[in-house]
Amino acid sequence: MSIESSATPTTPNAEALQLNSTEVRILGCLIEKQATNPETYPLTLNALVIACNQKTSRDPVMNLTQGQVGQSLRALEGRGLTRLVMGSRADRWEHKVDKGLELVPAQVILTGLLLLRGPQTVSELLTRSNRMHDFEDSEQVVHQLERLIARGLATLVPRQSGQREDRYMHLIGDPEDLQDLLAARQQAPERGNAASPAATQRLDELEARIAALEERLARLE
């Protein structure tokens, strides 16, 4: 399937970005940690590397080095998407996606989820965003996704054989990386075909707890 957007070009948009996979992961992590762990945000370089390499709530799982993350942070800073915050003990990094891409908070959260976990259904996005933004229902999620699509920052992926729902994916990455990610997700069985929404939510909550434990353990190593 060819990944295209029917949006009228605006500035800034996905065509002007085409971030690499490391940059995509960094922005997704900064958005996530700002929403879920505000007490430790902005993040130090070490904390950001740990977040990037989490084994849960990430698709794909990555193994980035401090050098790779640091280089990508500087590249993102040059595009106005991250900012270095100087500190007395350690320097920290924050994202500027809201200003850099002119997004409202709900759109920032959805973009972060799409950056971290690839193509997802509306139901998945609604469940996974519950700790980060208060969407009243799936219609609110769809409304914000449609605004991202209109900006050329996301696209609708029609359901494939064996799938019950359409999916949405971001268009901020390199086109070849996006094609590979989409192909992998289309070949994988749909998660939760026989699971209830409550069961899916419990699984996502468990993943969040595991991710928090992984982060604590990594800091002790």
From Swiss-Prot:
It comes from the Bacteria. InterPro entries: DUF480, WH-like_DNA-bd_sf, WH_DNA-bd_sf. SUPFAM superfamilies: Winged helix' DNA-binding domain. Pfam families: DUF480 (PF04337). Belongs to the UPF0502 family. This is UPF0502 protein PSPTO_2686. It comes from Pseudomonas syringae pv. tomato (strain ATCC BAA-871 / DC3000).
